């Protein structure tokens, strides 16, 4: 059975299971709920945010972009700690495994400070903390809500979340070499 067929079946099973158990959120609960980024963690697109999922939430998500497919299993472990397991299929020019590289990784996201009226929420996290190191990166991010519909995030990242010629990681993580797929 192909990877995409397994992914489609998993999605249908999860949808059917959640359809019966899902309960609508009240408007006040929805305003402070985090969205999931392409890595299955709280954030927008590929950038983390200093928000958390509701306590006890389990999420399954998948993304496809530029030939890469990621399947994410996210869970709110404790009130301030989010974790995610990821399995990814990445196009590889080396020809390994029918032209694809298969990667797995584990992330965590810790909300250190909750948002106050005049102070942002602050979170620390590590992407691909346990795994091959392909997506490895660490970050500290602050998020502040402006009104009920707008959130602004800013932060500092290392590893995959940093630019070229940036300074060394102060935590000492991320010394693993990335892979070149070209």
What are these regions (language model features)?
Residues 25-137, 143-150, 154, 158-163, ...:
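Transmembrane beta-barrel domains of Gram-negative outer membranes and organellar outer membranes
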Residues 1-37:
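Cleavable N-terminal export/targeting peptides
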